[in-house]
Amino acid sequence: MSLLEAFAEILEPADVHVAQRLTVLADEPDASVELAVALAVRALRGGSVCVDLRSVAGQVELPDLPWPDPDAWLAALAASPLLGQPPVLRLFGDLLYLDRYWLEEQQVCDDVLALVSARPGGAVPDVSRLFGAGFEEQRAAAKVALSQGLTVLTGGPGTGKTTTVARLLALLAEQAALAGKPSPRIALAAPTGKAAARLQEAVQLEIDQLDLIERRRLTGLHATTLHRLLGPRPDTSSRFRHHRANRLPHDVIVVDETSMVSLTMMARLLEAVRPQTRLVLVGDPDQLASVEAGAVLADLVEGLGSRGVAELKTSHRFGESIGALASAIRTGDADAALAVLAAGGEHIEWVHEDPVEQLREVVVPHAMRLRQAAILGDQREALATLDEHRLLCAHRRGPAGVDHWNRQVQRWLGEETGEPLWGSWYVGRPILVTANDYGLKLYNGDTGVVVATPDGMRAVIGDAGTFATGRLTDVETMHAMTIHKSQGSQADEVTVLLPSEDSRLLTRELFYTAVTRAKTRVRVVGAEAEVRAAIERQAVRATGLRKRLRPAGV
């Protein structure tokens, strides 16, 4: 049996194919090098940008596999022609990369450090004017952002990130006015359409509370997706119109929900930012990382530390119990989280026995209200109703998965109305866009509802408008959605379906992300063992960015 065959339990055919192809092309005979290549490809599927050859055996938790000795393994790789010129693989300490991801990580590091060290200069406005008593954390964050080119603004839900951003923009506009310059060109962006819409709404609400002179300086702000900001190209999905040779024209760029931004997307953003631009990256590093490879926000927080990170710690939004639950999950205190769940109350419900009937009592009335608004053709009411409740699942398939619960809710709707839903399109169908469509200006993560109109069924999708259903191909039903897809959005009430405790997706970050999607009420469906498993298991992504960012010797 070959070494790759011995690892068949953890490798996919694609991992093996790439490893075999590369080693043959490089005339590399060492089986341990071939295994390392396969593991590097496998790592990308799991969200890592590299594989840590000293710790991978412990992370896989299959000690009986014939793991190579780490020192001999690293020595074999260092001598491999695959690390020659041009390199196919790269080593960074114990970390093995495919060349592309090594280059992207180094580029992100270089660009971040250049922006952090940039000192824009100019008169500094009176920060305390907009950040008075009770805003000490936000005031400190604004001072950091006014003093350098890049700021990472972190905090959980309700800690005042949006307030800080809006008032920081007012201060930057004031700074420009003091220097006799026009108001800065400002871009607001987020990874998804839903997150961008939330960002624009929240920032505008804060700006509307400022004095008239500030409001005039900040007119016309419009949030967009990162893809739209960078300018999609029809010939490629990984490169954009704006890049190092054609930079973005903005003086200030704010990116929200940065935890969702992959390493590759961050590289594309940073190479398009002018050296004199202020870049503010906003997010919650305790949430799920991007679907694609990387853990950029968490790496920036750990790697930059006090050099570029401003953390907001005090939450002002949640009902006390939701905040307490989120805090217990974030800090890994399973006993405290279970105590909050057991106490229940107005904002918390814990369903830890057969949930089917209880879920029916929740999801069917919501689906019926959505259907009623859609039948009446009330687009605004339909979209508002859509955001009243979310049913969130960890998995797509299986008894606790999105596919199962979408079918179940549709069956219940058919029973309730006496009209079985035979077709894929129906009035009242909640939909989720699953891929970017640059022609229609629809983006992955946009949500909407199918409504009745005099011209037949139309899909109303956020701020993008209405569309004939026949024009939409990359959409799916959204009576339930995955927790990953819910990032960047919120609902008044959220129901979280935890998978079985042995699910590899069940992690602290997943649970925390799900709970913090709720504005006013969260319902957790799962046994005590599943709650404990979620809180005690942290997602591990292998990256080298935080190490690269740290000062030498730290």
Curated annotation (Swiss-Prot):
Tagged with keyword ATP-binding: yes
Record-annotated disulphide pairs: none
Listed InterPro entries: Coronavir_polyprotein_1ab, P-loop_NTPase, RecD, RecD_N, RecD_N_sf, UvrD-like_helicase_C
Keywords from the named record: ATP-binding, DNA damage, DNA repair, DNA-binding, Exonuclease, Helicase, Hydrolase, Isomerase, Nuclease, Nucleotide-binding
Native source species: Mycolicibacterium smegmatis (strain ATCC 700084 / mc(2)155)
Subunit annotation: Heterotrimer of RecB, RecC and RecD. All subunits contribute to DNA-binding.
Binding site for ATP: 155-162
GO cellular component: exodeoxyribonuclease V complex
Enzyme superclass (EC): isomerase
Molecular function GO labels: 5'-3' DNA helicase activity; ATP binding; ATP hydrolysis activity; DNA binding; exodeoxyribonuclease V activity; single-stranded DNA helicase activity
Similarity comment text for this entry: Belongs to the RecD family.
Protein name (record): RecBCD enzyme subunit RecD
EC number(s) reported in the record: 5.6.2.3
Function, in words: A helicase/nuclease that prepares dsDNA breaks (DSB) for recombinational DNA repair. Binds to DSBs and unwinds DNA via a highly rapid and processive ATP-dependent bidirectional helicase activity. Holoenzyme degrades any linearized DNA that is unable to undergo homologous recombination. In the holoenzyme this subunit has ssDNA-dependent ATPase and 5'-3' helicase activity. When added to pre-assembled RecBC greatly stimulates nuclease activity and augments holoenzyme processivity.
One GO term of the biological process aspect: double-strand break repair via homologous recombination
Catalytic activity: Couples ATP hydrolysis with the unwinding of duplex DNA at the replication fork by translocating in the 5'-3' direction. This creates two antiparallel DNA single strands (ssDNA). The leading ssDNA polymer is the template for DNA polymerase III holoenzyme which synthesizes a continuous strand; ATP + H2O = ADP + phosphate + H(+)
Misc: In the RecBCD complex, RecB has a slow 3'-5' helicase, an exonuclease activity and loads RecA onto ssDNA, RecD has a fast 5'-3' helicase activity, while RecC stimulates the ATPase and processivity of the RecB helicase and contributes to recognition of the Chi site.
Phenotype caused by lack of the gene: Unlike E.coli, triple recB-recC-recD deletion is no more sensitive to DNA damaging agents (UV light sensitivity, mitomycin C, methyl methanesulphonate or ionizing radiation) than wild-type; has reduced resistance to H(2)O(2) which is exacerbated by further adnA-adnB deletion. Triple mutants have no effect on homologous recombination or on NHEJ of blunt-end, 5'- or 3'-overhang DSBs or on incompatible 3'-chromosomal overhangs. However the triple mutant disrupts all single-strand annealing repair of DSB.
